[in-house]
């Protein structure tokens, strides 16, 4: 990683801090802990299940919203403020700008996830009074959630490289929703025929398979997660992220910024 990419990533992270994203998430973590504790206390004998399910789902959804709405503005804000022209007038290549923005946003989301994870574990400790061995699976679920954020970040940058912030948000959110039901879409494709089957199958394999990264229910029910699943999801997420980021770079390299 070049020094220029690191510098852009660091500035992107600082901008997120100045926008008080991290402070809002700390408050969110506290609210999440309180809500999970309240729901857990009124859920007899399933306190742990409720806290883990509610907590991890909130971490995922809130992080996706942050990834989309910060990601879609990373390029457009620089153009509107005309700071992009200053950056590119220096010995900074366009691909370095995109990659630096990605790492800056990804780093922001990793820190966000850390703070929200503290809220989840705090709520779990309150209702269960201790940690058990299966609770380590929560770390795997959080890892998959971070991989999910990486894909969303790359998609947000991809769409923002050629469209308006509004359309970028619509595209990214739509892909998130469709990708969350990718497995169901593949099952539906197997029940159809002709053009519908062809279209559904193509869509199921083109959209990011977020359903494979969602192990929240399995973790809440303390079901084991194999090393093969972790490896497959890691390779899949990194590959999809790299492809989307490459697309963003190619489009941005050819974009007329005048």
Spans of features found by a protein language model:
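Short cytosolic juxtamembrane segments of multi-pass membrane proteins
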Residues: 254-258
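Helix-loop-helix units of permease transmembrane domains in multi-pass membrane transporters
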Residues: 9, 74-106, 252
């Amino acid at each position: 990683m070049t020094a220029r990419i690191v510098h852009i990533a660091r500035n992107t992270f600082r901008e997120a801090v100045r926008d008080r994203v991290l402070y809002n998430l700390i408050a969110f973590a506290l609210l999440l802990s309180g809500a999970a504790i309240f729901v857990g206390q009124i859920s007899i004998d399933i306190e742990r299940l409720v806290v883990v399910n509610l907590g991890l789902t909130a971490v995922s959804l809130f992080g996706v919203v942050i990834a989309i709405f910060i990601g879609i503005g990373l390029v457009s804000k620089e153009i509107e403020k005309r700071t992009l022209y200053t950056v590119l007038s220096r010995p900074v290549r366009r691909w370095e700008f995109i990659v630096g923005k990605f790492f800056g946003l990804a780093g922001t989301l990793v820190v966000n996830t850390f703070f929200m994870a503290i809220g989840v574990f705090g709520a779990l400790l309150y209702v269960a009074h201790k940690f058990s061995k299966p609770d380590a699976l929560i770390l795997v679920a959080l890892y998959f959630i971070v991989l999910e954020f990486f894909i969303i970040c790359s998609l947000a940058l991809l769409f923002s490289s050629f469209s308006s912030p509004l359309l970028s948000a619509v595209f990214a959110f739509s892909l998130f929703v469709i990708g969350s039901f990718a497995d169901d879409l593949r099952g539906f494709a197997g029940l159809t025929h002709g053009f519908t089957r062809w279209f559904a199958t193509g869509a199921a394999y083109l959209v990011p398979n977020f359903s494979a990264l969602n192990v929240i229910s399995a973790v809440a029910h303390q079901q084991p997660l194999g090393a093969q699943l972790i490896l497959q999801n890691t390779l899949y997420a990194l590959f999809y992220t790299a492809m989307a980021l490459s697309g963003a770079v190619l489009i941005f390299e050819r974009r007329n910024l005048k």
